[in-house]
């Protein structure tokens, strides 16, 4: 994802594209990267629209879809159609498992909070030199890998073992703690290797651990694959603040429509825990805020930059003298907004809307 988005950003800057076009190009790069990496073209599109563009429009939707499809096609031509891991969980979901899903969603949300805050803790150390930061990453990762070698690489083999239920509780917890710490350290200090893969591994192993801890307390047996998949989706949705993309990824990875309902419930609880209880917005938003960017404000400015002045220009204007009773004049009745000026040589001091006037007179 980062490689695709970064490459697209550099290309757009080299071409001198305007900001709104550059944002669309970055979204295309991110969608293509996700699609090529995980063979999930739909999730790539939804992630780009949900996190980067933050709106669903035809202008942005079509190029993102094309980029995502091309990413999947090229990846399959080069590497084949085999996916990195097969999550085929064609299992039924019983109502008795709902309490487990609620508690699991809460725990996944807390894990996402821990990851986000640890990431931001290391992100604040960017004032140190790149060489020093990368040296620390290498040394710490190597030392931890001596004791927990499962943290190295993509971790998909470990995730496959968790799905098959062959890992012990101790190993699962060690992988969760070690992978969470090392990934937060590496990404926080500037060595971005992606967040989607690690979040899937952390969430999946945590889900595998939860079913071993609390599965026997439930009135019905819980398939380890069910809990692992819930963890994958909830952790991805909460960490990236992309619940819709995580839900679509569930459908594409599991090939099981039955998993949509439990995934929705778990992701909602995890995201609410992250945002409402701990006030976090996910890794990307927190990082942008720390750098002084208001993503919502920037999004609004981006929308206004795409609107021409002629399309919002007010044609009907009327000149009303100060302290007069001309607001009842025919010229004023057609106005929605009345500009307030001190004199014709002075700029506009403000505006009075028709709603303000009607509310003032109790009409």
Where are these regions (language model features)?
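Alpha-helical transmembrane segments and immediately membrane-proximal extracytoplasmic
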Residues: 1-315, 350
């Amino acid at each position: 994802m980062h490689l695709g988005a970064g490459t697209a950003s550099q290309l757009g800057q080299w071409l001198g594209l305007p900001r709104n076009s550059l944002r669309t190009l970055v979204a295309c790069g991110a969608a293509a990267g996700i699609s090529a990496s995980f063979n999930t073209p739909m999730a790539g599109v939804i992630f780009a629209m949900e996190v980067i563009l933050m709106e669903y429009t035809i202008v942005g939707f079509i190029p993102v879809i094309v980029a995502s499809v091309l990413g999947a096609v090229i990846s399959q031509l080069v590497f084949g159609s085999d996916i990195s891991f097969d999550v085929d969980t064609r299992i039924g979901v019983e109502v008795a498992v709902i309490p487990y899903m609620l508690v699991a969603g809460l725990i996944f949300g807390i894990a996402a909070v821990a990851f986000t805050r640890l990431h931001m803790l290391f992100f604040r150390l960017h004032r140190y030199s790149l060489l020093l930061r990368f040296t620390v990453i290498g040394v710490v990762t190597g030392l931890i890998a001596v004791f927990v070698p499962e943290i190295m690489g993509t971790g998909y083999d470990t995730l496959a073992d968790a799905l098959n239920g062959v890992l012990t509780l101790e190993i699962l917890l060690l992988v969760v703690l070690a992978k969470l710490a090392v990934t937060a350290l590496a990404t926080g200090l500037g060595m971005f290797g992606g967040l989607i893969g690690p979040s899937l591994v952390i969430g999946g192993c945590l889900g595998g651990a939860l079913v071993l801890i609390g599965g026997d307390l439930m009135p019905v047996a819980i398939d380890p694959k069910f809990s692992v998949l819930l963890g994958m989706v909830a952790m991805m949705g909460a960490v990236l603040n992309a619940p819709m993309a995580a839900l679509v990824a569930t459908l594409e990875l599991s090939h099981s429509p039955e998993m949509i309902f439990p995934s929705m419930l778990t992701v909602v609880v995890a995201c609410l825990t992250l945002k409402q209880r701990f006030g976090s917005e996910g890794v990307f938003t927190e990082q942008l805020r720390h750098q002084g960017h208001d993503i919502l404000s920037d999004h609004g400015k981006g929308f206004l930059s795409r609107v021409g002045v002629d399309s919002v220009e007010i044609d009907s204007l009327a000149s009303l003298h100060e302290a007069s009773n001309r607001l009842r004049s025919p010229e004023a009745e057609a106005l929605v907004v009345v500009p307030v000026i001190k004199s014709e040589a002075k700029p506009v001091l403000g505006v009075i809307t028709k709603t303000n006037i009607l509310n003032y007179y109790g009409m």
